[in-house]
Amino acid sequence: MAQLIDGKKLAEDVVSTVKTETEKLVAATGVVPGIAVVIVGEDPASQVYVASKSRKAKECGFHSVQHDLPETASEQELLNLIEGLNNDPAIHGILVQLPLPGHIDSGRVIQTIAPEKDVDGFHFINVGKLGTGEVETAFVPCTPAGAMIMIERVHGRDLSGLNAVVIGRSNIVGKPMFNLLLAANATVTVAHSRTKDLPAIARNADILVAAVGRPQMVKGDWVKPGATVIDVGINRIPAPERGEGKTRLVGDVDFAEAEKVAGAITPVPGGVGPMTIAMLMANTLTAACRSAGMKKPVF
């Protein structure tokens, strides 16, 4: 039976470090990490995400502000707001909750955020830094950053000699995951929907990262015995056994099958998910430390 990589516990450890390092930063410099969360419209899922981010920021001792714009807000109004936040010395991290309404160009909005305040790690400058191995000065997207900490807890920081396979090539998870694994000296293959004989490629992985958004796609016989399996997927599927109309959350990996083969595995829920918000807090603290000329903490 595989070792369970407990995302809730690891996220608590990260947040605990953030709290301690925040207190040190405030004591040494008077700088309080500040995060601004911007939400446009009233999408219920976005409201839940934003509320949880704001709660966690306050728990960490941050200065946290939320800007709510109506669904009808123009792109220019949003850009003007971001420009103001870019110039606000009390704000170190800016997060625009996606998705945005259809009349707003998300790409343009994200590229307007000052790279040094881009705690989501989506600005081209941060993407480029990560792609050229400048991990120390980049902001890394929160989900792959959290997944990487989970891998490090099993294998350490140096992955020399290990084969890693990332299933999925999104800009948010797949590509940054590839770059992080490569920077840690793993030999990395990126697979996707056009990959030939995906199960055979997956079976070669000492570290298998699934980030495709297809429920339970990765079966037990895709997993190399003893491999570390990181399941980034969050999918809601019908659960008639719980009652009519009920659903449950599953990952991209068939957990029941894979758990019997893997050496270590993340559950869904309670795996990568909690790490995402924890790493957002870590990135915000890092931004504040950089602005104060202090060394960034190690998580």
From Swiss-Prot:
It comes from the Bacteria. Catalyzes the oxidation of 5,10-methylenetetrahydrofolate to 5,10-methenyltetrahydrofolate and then the hydrolysis of 5,10-methenyltetrahydrofolate to 10-formyltetrahydrofolate. This is Bifunctional protein FolD. The keyword NADP applies. The lineage of its organism: Bacteria, Pseudomonadati, Pseudomonadota, Alphaproteobacteria, Hyphomicrobiales. It comes from Brucella canis (strain ATCC 23365 / NCTC 10854 / RM-666). Pathway: One-carbon metabolism; tetrahydrofolate interconversion. Its EC number is 1.5.1.5, 3.5.4.9. The keyword Amino-acid biosynthesis applies. It catalyses: (6R)-5,10-methylene-5,6,7,8-tetrahydrofolate + NADP(+) = (6R)-5,10-methenyltetrahydrofolate + NADPH; (6R)-5,10-methenyltetrahydrofolate + H2O = (6R)-10-formyltetrahydrofolate + H(+). Homodimer. SUPFAM superfamilies: Aminoacid dehydrogenase-like, N-terminal domain (SSF53223), NAD(P)-binding Rossmann-fold domains (SSF51735). NADP(+) binds at residues 168-170, 193, 234.
